[in-house]
């Protein structure tokens, strides 16, 4: 597993020519399925500021390798604000405070979110992720999606 906090700031390079495309700024996630759908980038000179997860060849200790130098723009109107995960308020579906999101552990090959780390030291399974909004990350309670 890799941690988002260790991935942010890593250079993103093209597999074609090893040229730096940008640096990792964050993740775009799909709560349904707890999957990373894209990487948000900083420092991109040409093109968009997001690369689709399917174009990520490897997430290593020193860099992220992507298969294309042209990055796809994240066109959703609710994009970047909703995807700044670290430090975002963490709430249960009942509205109870669960601290803030301190980190996200994910599988660097599949993009599956394994664990959400709360500022209170709780480890919340990724399958409990219900939503990511501008205000908070929401996790399920009860049954398989409980805290």
Enumerate the language-model features and the residues they cover:
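Peripheral interaction segments used for macromolecular assembly
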Residues: 1-147
């Amino acid at each position: 597993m890799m941690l988002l906090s260790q991935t942010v700031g890593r250079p993103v390079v093209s597999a074609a020519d090893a040229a730096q495309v940008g640096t990792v700024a964050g993740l775009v996630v799909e709560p349904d399925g707890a999957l990373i759908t894209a990487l948000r980038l900083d420092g991109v000179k040409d093109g968009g500021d997001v690369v689709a997860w399917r174009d990520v060849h490897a997430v290593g200790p020193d860099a992220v390798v992507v298969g294309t130098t042209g990055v796809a723009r994240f066109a959703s109107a609710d994009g970047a604000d909703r995807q700044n995960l670290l430090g975002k308020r963490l709430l249960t579906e009942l509205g109870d405070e669960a601290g803030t999101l301190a980190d996200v552990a994910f599988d660097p090959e599949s993009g599956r979110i394994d664990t959400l780390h709360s500022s209170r030291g709780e480890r919340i399974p990724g399958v409990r992720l219900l939503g990511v909004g501008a205000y908070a990350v929401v996790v399920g309670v009860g049954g398989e999606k409980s805290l």
